[in-house]
A protein has these predicted regions:
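Core nucleotide-handling region used for phosphoryl-transfer chemistry
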Residues: 1-251
């Protein structure tokens, strides 16, 4: 499911409603520009799903689109005991990368075994619907360790301080020439990281926080509802308005 843009949400709601959102418990991780790969254990072995597809990849798919073979090969190489630990009603969602250079971002490194565990879908009894989505960083870290992949790095977790809220609103208010001037000396990536964690000096797959990133995932817990947003540069958003050819690797 696509993430709602935080800037769009900020522009569309009343100030009081947005401030109320900022008062909720917050979790921030980096948004990686990568492919999506889902994995689920069934009676006859693991099934692999591309992007948002409900049908698993079959042998013909894998022959035509060999892009996913490195990721699939990683799971084929895991010991049986680790595979057997995977609950059959859980569908594990991963960011998947085989090259440091993506559509318009060049990272310094690749994730562990090319995979980042970003979420886990808990399915209903007949496995046709998603009952809930697990994004708890502690659960993801545990399963990433079991499956020998990377887990999301938590940039911030807790209640935002007033100065953080002010910095965030300042970034969300920027657009056009004002944004270009703001990010001329220090990039959007630098400013975004510093909103949530002033001691951060390294991005998830970059050696510093000055290089471009795809954005941040900013989540707020309202009661029992988790609201997930993407925070991206207004310059990137303006560029994405222009149509471009889709790439199977980044759907």
């Amino acid at each position: 499911m696509a993430l709602q843009d935080l800037r769009t949400y900020y522009d569309s709601v009343e100030k009081e409603d947005f401030n109320s959102l900022l008062n909720q418990r917050c979790l921030v991780t980096e948004k990686i520009q990568a492919s999506s790969l889902h994995v689920r254990r069934e009676d006859d072995g693991l099934k692999f799903y591309k992007s948002g597809n409900k049908q698993p990849l079959n042998k013909i798919d894998r022959t035509i689109v060999s892009y996913y073979e490195r990721g699939i090969g990683h799971f084929d190489a895991l010991i049986k005991e680790k595979i057997d630990e995977m609950p059959m009603d859980w569908k594990f969602g991963f960011d998947y990368m085989i090259n440091e250079k993506t559509v318009d971002i060049e990272y310094d490194t690749l994730p562990k075994n090319n995979l980042i565990l970003t979420h886990i879908q808990v399915l209903n009894e007949d496995r046709t619907q998603i009952r809930k989505v697990i994004r708890d960083p502690r659960i993801l870290e545990k399963w990433a360790d079991i499956l020998e992949v990377q887990s999301p790095e938590v940039i911030f977790e807790g209640i935002l301080a007033d100065y953080q809220k002010e910095k965030l609103i300042n970034i969300l208010s920027l657009q056009g020439e004002q944004a270009r001037m703001k990010f001329e000396d220090f990039t959007f990536s630098y400013h975004a990281f510093k909103v949530f964690n002033e001691s951060t000096h390294k991005a998830m797959l970059n050696n510093d926080i000055h290089k471009d990133i795809d954005g941040l995932v900013v989540s707020f817990l309202e009661g029992k509802t988790l609201k997930n947003f993407k925070l991206q540069s207004p310059l990137k958003e303006a560029k994405e308005v222009e149509p471009r050819k889709s790439s199977d690797a980044y759907q």
